[in-house]
């Protein structure tokens, strides 16, 4: 999405970050997504088997690019959470997709990246 590129460019123009400060996030694995989401929801999102009503609830059409973006946004939140635990600070410019439910998306959110990261951190810290 163009807004993420524009945000990154603006942060660099302001001198807050250098190009080397940014990393390409890993895509969240199916296993990570299933820490919060049902196996059926994850499978159907990845396979493009969503109903018209589910797509309308999310707010944008299904595409391979959408799936990749959602997986990487979630992976970035997981990575940022790990980095924050290790280094006391981290940023994910694309995170915050917290409207998704375990078995469905909503409000422009397919996966709940915040919940996935919290579950992952809880499993690794406890």
Regions found by a protein language model. Name each.
Residues 1-124:
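HDAC/HDAC-like amidohydrolase catalytic core signature
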